[in-house]
Amino acid sequence: MKTRTAAVIALLAPCATALAATELVINEYNSVRDDRWLGCGEGAAGATCIRAGESSSDTDTFRGRTIGNGGDWIEFVVAVDHADIRGWKVQWVSTAPSSTGLPVTNGTALWYPDGNLPQGEFTFSQDARWSDLRAGTIITITRDGTAAGGLDTDLSFEPCLGDWWMNVNLSSSSLVSAQWNFASFPAFPNLMNGNKLYIDHQNWWVQVLRADGSEAIPLMGEGTGGTLCCVGSYEVPALREDPTPNINTFSNYSDANSSSFGAPNTWKDTVTGCRKRQSMDALRAPVLAQLCSPCRLIALNEYNAVKSDRFLGGGTLAQDANTPPGTASDAQFGRVLGNGGNWFELVVLSDHLDMRGWTLEWSETGYSGTIALSNAAFWGDLRIGTIITFIERTTALGGLNTDLSYNGTTDTWVNVNTQDVSLVSLTTSNKPGHVSGAFTTSNDKWSLRAKDSSGAAVMGSMGAGFASYNGGTVNAEDVCRLRADVAPGTDGNAWFDDSGSSSTFGRANTWTGCPVASTETQSFATLLTSGCEAPSSGGPDLNGDGTVDGQDLGILLGSWSGTGPADLNGDGTVDGQDLGILLGSWGTPG
């Protein structure tokens, strides 16, 4: 077997010096056996398997901990802009017997010379959606659909809202076609009735051919002479460096006990022990510059996931359960059960932002809801860098009442209590017993998005429930927060992470650095000097009450010689021209 393998590699795999730039990069693929769990564990008992020296079970950032880790799937990153992969083939072969035995083949050599080895391929169709892929796009291919624990096809792609991921299930025959040479599979007979993809952990090889037959990705995988070695049936091989067109089989691929399906990879540095995160910024920057405004409007900064009967960091009032133990607390509430209840924090990314009539939409596993903002004048002109906290509990119940004090220098935080009907007109939820004013934050894959008064999406999903989240698992004794400086383009792809050591309601986030364990504080400096201005609301009904009248005139005169929503002609100054526009609409809806 070893002699034959060496001979075939010599024929199929080019030398390192001949490797050329590629439009697609293999970023990750799932080698977890269908009856096993990521990291360790087999059968039902594996659900809570904890490996020696670790405090929790290993998980995937998208699906958590599931048997089989989502079935067979492979993930690509588009490394060259405007890539056309119509007619491309992804070819795979399993060259060594697994611990459960390989499938029985029909002897057909679909592409690999030995038809007795399990092999197959899938081909991208001529569908136009494959003709112009943008750099930085993540493409996952799944064997199983959602009902079977995998994922159905979803080609949504909205980079200006942070969505760079497309998933294709092999059942989507208009997008892909697949074949293999299996006659039977005694170890997993159910797979014979599904889509044709099989990923093994021992000496599983893959290559990608362009439509003209040239190699886009030469043969790679365990045993092909590259860096990948010793993949187990509990593991996921993944790229541990940033994707570029020059990635090849000799790049830093390694097996891992965690995975990040549909999101950039993360790993622990073997030297420093620090958590590292794959960056797509270099690939995506030109695309964002072409398609999107450099200035987003608003971003999620932090939210509370601590359950009402638990403390931040767990433990008791006197001591948390962290290592080493301490007294984890919030900067506003101190160390209290529930850490202040349901709350989240936003940061304004563009100056003079008008949020009147906006709807904030939250979701978690099984539940969702909305927070409808009123047309109060307060929402009509929010300044860049403002921190806005939303909280359900009043001060009397351990939360905080509305406080809109703000001076732009020493005080840049406002608090909105969602029971305040002057600011929040309505909240909704499909949770039993919901009453208006209530909302939820939690550790159950929670996320938040926003729509403006017209219903247009203005903030894509952000939080641990967003597909591109690749921080630590948020548990019921954590907050989730942005572990990075706030920037004009901050979206759901930014580095969000869990924290059970501290939270900072209404303040800049903090975190512990690595490898030097010092406290780092979030900076707003880049944001505040960005010059980002929110687009004008475009109408003279400045208070949004449905009629242009004296109240709107008062708002305009109060903004005289300044900027903001009252700059109706968008020339940068509120002056007589804007007054003329307002008076010309007097008594109308605007």
Regions found by a protein language model. Name each.
Residues 13, 17-19, 67, 337, ...:
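Generic structural signal for beta-strand residues in well-ordered domains
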Residues 248-293, 496-538:
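A recurrent domain-boundary module in secreted/ectodomain proteins
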Residues 1-22:
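Sec-dependent, cleavable N-terminal signal peptides
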Residues 20-202, 208-251, 255, 292-444, ...:
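Activation on beta-sandwich/Ig-like modules and their edge loops
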Residues 7, 15, 214, 293-294, ...:
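Compositionally biased, intrinsically disordered low-complexity regions
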Residues 532-590:
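Cellulosome-associated attachment modules in secreted, modular CAZymes
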Residues 5-8, 12, 193, 206, ...:
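Intrinsically disordered, low-complexity repeat segments enriched in small/polar residues
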